[in-house]
């Protein structure tokens, strides 16, 4: 299992595997991740079998899947990077810029953990 999908399932009403498959379906339909760049182009930069591989429970999710989750569920996701000495946070917003819920996760450099959620 992937810690990202497990962390998202903590806040969403879906199992981690359901979230993974919903996100992969979204990517497979070539729906936009970010404004101005086709999703198939973004995925081709990584691996031509990206979605097929991501459907496997052993694959780790990352920024692409976080952005897809934002778009699917109108979420703002804040990832607190707590790896290393320099702490930072990365904010992901849905392509519509309208979100109803904020989810916060921590990233340790190789692991996501759920932190908290709140209304927009």
List PLM regions with ranges.
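Short amphipathic alpha-helical segments embedded in low-complexity Lys/Glu-rich regions
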Residues: 19-26, 37-46, 83-89
């Amino acid at each position: 299992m992937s810690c990202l999908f497990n962390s998202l399932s903590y806040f969403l009403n879906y199992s981690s595997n359901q979230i993974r498959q919903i996100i992969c379906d979204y990517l497979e339909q070539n729906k936009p991740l970010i404004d101005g760049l086709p999703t198939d182009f973004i995925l081709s930069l990584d691996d031509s079998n990206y979605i097929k591989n991501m459907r496997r429970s052993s694959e780790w999710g990352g920024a692409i899947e976080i952005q897809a989750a934002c778009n699917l569920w109108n979420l703002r996701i804040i990832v607190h990077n707590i790896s290393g000495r320099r702490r930072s946070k990365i904010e992901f917003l849905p392509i519509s810029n309208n979100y109803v819920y904020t989810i916060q996760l921590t990233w340790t450099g190789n692991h996501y953990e759920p932190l908290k959620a709140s209304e927009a």
